[in-house]
């Protein structure tokens, strides 16, 4: 959300950015250690830390958000300003890559510090002082200073979608929240060469980049099945942030040079699947899947070939290609993680996509479990001024339920910054 904070700083505000994880330099070391050893730091990982979950992703910057006001362009120009390749300004499917994005984030932070912003790392918001539906203070907790108070009447909640303890705190504080639909599934790998041949043709020229794809299907049972966060030349990564939970995601570097393409193939779920309708029902649904997934792999990424998945059989060896992962893997049965209706929809989706991309439903396509954090399972409600039912608190971005990626989250952050400026600095143009 540095773009949001940049706008506030330029309007004369001095934002305090509270980050529960570490600086990106330290965070990168923590993540690499986890991938190599399996030792998870719950405070600094693929989900938590400077830059959020997007830091360890493909770094996609395309968005379906229609924004004629130019905020989308501002987001791209800001990334270029701080070190991204200028090609993102004209590329139809712009992406930064996790290696470049990490450098951009540091440049953004240093710029903001020079303009009066304060960054507080390895610190979690654990309470809010609210009187008569108005914010008075924010309380934080860190290893060096527990229950520290920051007096303020303005707080932007840019949580990310994995801050479940914070969701609990907000729910218990009386924030108006609701559960919402999202999607879960498996990360699926294919040889990048196969995808290139299907998308470009057999005589793919070397000047062409690794090909992306986007596939979607809807079925009579009301479920949608579609690709999400497709990573050409990428890696499947263990993106767990909670002990005894296993979650996967996709990531690629700027040059997208791994041998495999991967994407989450996910199945839509709605509140009727959760068995409850309170705001945290979707969170509990995710946790149930992630803990069972952890058990299947004993903390490693559980994998199964698609053909074996269809036959309900344990995989014992890869087929014609191996897996490109960050994090250790183990063969395990993924059958039964999703309910029967969802599992059947996943299989039908894969078969349908095989008609769109030759070989997509090949028997040795590699499934990794599970992809559960495609978007926030809840929404923190806000009014037309972007405030929640608690005056001074502004829910923002993906975790609050108003975005679905780097660019859309940045656009939402800009909107929130504009609302704050309008209320507190109406003279600023």
Question: Where are each of the predicted segments found?
Answer:
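Residues forming the flavin
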Residues: 3-429
């Amino acid at each position: 959300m540095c773009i949001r904070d940049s706008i506030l700083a330029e309007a004369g505000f001095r934002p305090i950015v509270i980050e529960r994880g570490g600086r990106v330099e330290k965070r990168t070391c923590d993540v690499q250690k986890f991938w190599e050893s399996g030792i998870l730091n719950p405070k600094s990982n693929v989900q938590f830390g400077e830059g959020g979950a997007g830091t360890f992703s493909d770094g996609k910057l395309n968005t379906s958000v229609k924004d004629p006001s130019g905020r989308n362009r501002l987001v791209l120009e800001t990334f270029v300003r701080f070190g991204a390749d200028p090609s993102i300004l004209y590329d139809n499917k712009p992406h930064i890559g996790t290696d470049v994005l990490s450098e951009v984030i540091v440049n953004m932070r240093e710029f903001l510090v020079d303009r009066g912003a304060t960054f507080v790392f390895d610190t979690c918001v654990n309470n809010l002082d609210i009187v008569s539906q108005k914010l008075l203070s924010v309380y934080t907790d860190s290893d060096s200073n527990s229950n520290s108070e920051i007096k303020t009447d303005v707080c932007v909640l840019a949580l990310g979608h994995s801050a479940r303890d914070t969701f609990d705190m907000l729910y218990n504080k009386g924030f108006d929240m609701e559960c919402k639909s999202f999607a879960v599934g498996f990360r699926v790998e294919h040889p990048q060469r196969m995808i290139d041949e299907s998308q470009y043709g057999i005589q793919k020229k070397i000047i062409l980049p690794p090909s992306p794809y986007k596939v979607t299907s809807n079925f009579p049972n009301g479920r949608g099945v579609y690709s999400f966060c497709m990573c050409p030349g990428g890696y499947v990564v263990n993106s767990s942030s909670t002990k005894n939970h296993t979650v996967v995601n996709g990531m690629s570097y700027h040059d997208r040079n791994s041998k495999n393409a991967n994407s989450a193939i996910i199945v839509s779920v709605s509140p009727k699947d959760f068995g409850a309708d309170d705001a945290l029902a979707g969170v509990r649904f995710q946790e149930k899947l992630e803990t069972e997934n952890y058990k299947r792999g004993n903390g490693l990424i559980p994998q199964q070939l698609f053909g074996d998945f269809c036959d309900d059989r344990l995989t014992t060896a890869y087929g014609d290609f191996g897996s490109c992962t960050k994090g250790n893997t183990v063969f395990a049965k993924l059958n039964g993680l999703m309910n029967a209706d969802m599992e059947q929809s996943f299989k039908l989706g894969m078969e349908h996509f095989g008609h769109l991309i030759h070989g997509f439903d090949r028997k040795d396509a590699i499934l990794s479990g599970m992809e559960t954090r495609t978007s926030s399972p809840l929404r923190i409600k806000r009014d037309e001024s972007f405030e929640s039912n608690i005056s001074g608190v502004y829910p923002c971005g993906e975790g609050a339920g108003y975005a679905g990626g780097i660019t859309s989250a940045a656009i939402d952050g800009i909107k929130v910054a504009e609302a704050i400026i309008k209320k507190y600095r109406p003279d600023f143009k």
